Regions:
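Short amphipathic alpha-helical segments at helix-loop
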Residues: 137, 227-230, 286
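Residues within well-ordered alpha helices
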Residues: 55, 61, 156-159, 201, ...
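Short, low-complexity disordered leader/linker segments with a strong preference
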Residues: 1-36, 339-343
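Secondary-structure end/capping motifs
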Residues: 234-314
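Pocket-lining segment of extracytoplasmic ligand-binding domains
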Residues: 179-269
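Short, glycine-/small- and polar/acidic-enriched structural segments
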Residues: 32-178, 183, 190-196, 207-213, ...
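Glycine-rich, flexible loop/turn motifs
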Residues: 49, 58, 119-120, 131, ...
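Conserved C-terminal helix/tail region of periplasmic/extracytoplasmic solute-binding proteins
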Residues: 306-343
Length: 343
């Protein structure tokens, strides 16, 4: 049973949208008695990582906190999110960490992570391989687009070699979960890095989970909400409202299974509801109640990145994190109040 996207669903990048990069006093509209500030947000691709942002939007929490955000945009990958942030097409973006870190250290962008997020990743093996020790001398799919997949493939090859599982080679595969699964099941490669809900479909087709990146403290630290540094500095109140709404949305995600599953099935185009339910049940445990950016994990990525991006050498990941908005919410009791409200 495939994790089918609904027919006719398209990824559309509207690069003609106006920039809303303005001061806190700027672009507003009135809705009833409340004045809403109009901004734009987006995420890299359809998948579990975008779940909290879509739950926040669907639950009306951005409006609750004074922001007018149209449906968050699919930006066509992390590089698209970086581009959208830098051009002002969007003001806040959800994405995995490698692309913005690479752009930052190369001097192409100045982005900061404001929260952590969900980005659960696994290595799955083709039918017939049930353990990581069987990957010696085998092939692992490699997309080659410079994104998170590439970083994690290179990372796991090195980590397995350190553990005595040597000779795992990169094998080019097309991007997209469905095509990667096809390559895996057909034997074109022996393993792939994959994320829910596609990993659930792979398991249904006889593939096995052999590595959970949680072992390396990476699953909830590979990305999150990012913005341009100068935008945050010029618009602290807008940023504060966005993060407050997002944190409340993450709480709704963690505590309201039915609502989250419905939203996930809708925005992902998953026709099989059980796949959305399994995705939720797989990602919910361990999801942090306070979504701080994890500096130590970002540092792991930066240090590993030095092999391909020399500019990353000796760079401190703390340069690319601003967690004071999250700390405010925790220190003022807002986050604790969300749990109280569910009792």
């Amino acid at each position: 049973m495939a994790v089918n996207r609904r027919k006719g669903q398209a990824i559309h990048l509207d690069l003609s949208m106006p920039s809303y990069d303005r001061s806190d006093a700027g672009n507003t509209r009135t809705s009833g008695m409340a004045e809403l500030i109009k901004i734009a947000a987006g995420f890299a691709t359809i998948g579990q990582g975008a779940g909290p942002m879509m739950v926040t939007w669907k639950a009306g929490l951005f409006k609750k906190h004074g922001l007018d955000i149209e449906k968050p945009r699919i930006m066509g990958g992390a590089k698209g999110v970086v581009r959208g942030l830098m051009t002002g097409e969007i003001q806040f973006g959800n994405m995995a960490a490698p692309a913005p870190l690479r752009s930052n250290v190369k001097g192409e962008a100045d982005l900061i992570f404001l929260t952590g997020g969900i980005n659960q990743q696994f290595v799955m093996a083709r039918p017939g391989i049930t353990g990581r020790e069987q990957l010696t001398g085998k092939k692992i799919g490699f997309v080659g687009d410079g994104g998170l997949n590439d970083a994690l493939v290179s990372f796991i090859i090195e980590k397995l070699a350190e553990a005595g599982i040597e000779g795992l080679q990169k094998e080019p595969v097309p991007g997209g979960g469905d095509r990667q699964i096809a390559a895996l099941v057909s034997g074109s490669c022996d393993a792939i890095v994959i994320t829910p809900p596609e990993s659930i479909e792979a398991r249904r087709r006889g593939c096995s989970y052999v590595i959970d990146f949680a072992e390396y403290v990476l699953n909830y630290a590979l990305g999150g909400i990012a913005a341009r540094r100068d935008y945050v500095e010029k618009n602290p109140e807008i940023t504060r409202r966005f993060i407050k709404a997002y944190v409340e949305g993450m709480h709704r995600y963690r505590t309201d299974r039915d609502f989250t599953v419905n939203v996930q099935a809708e925005y992902s185009g998953i026709a099989d509801r059980t796949a959305a339910e399994e995705t939720y049940d797989l990602t919910r445990p361990g999801m942090p109640p306070v979504p701080y950016p994890i500096v130590t994990s970002l540092q792991v990525l930066l240090d590993f990145m030095t092999k391909e991006v020399p500019e990353a050498k000796n760079v401190d990941a703390r340069r690319f994190v601003d967690d004071h908005f999250i700390r405010e919410l925790e220190d003022t009791g807002f986050i604790a109040s969300l749990d109280e409200s569910r009792k």
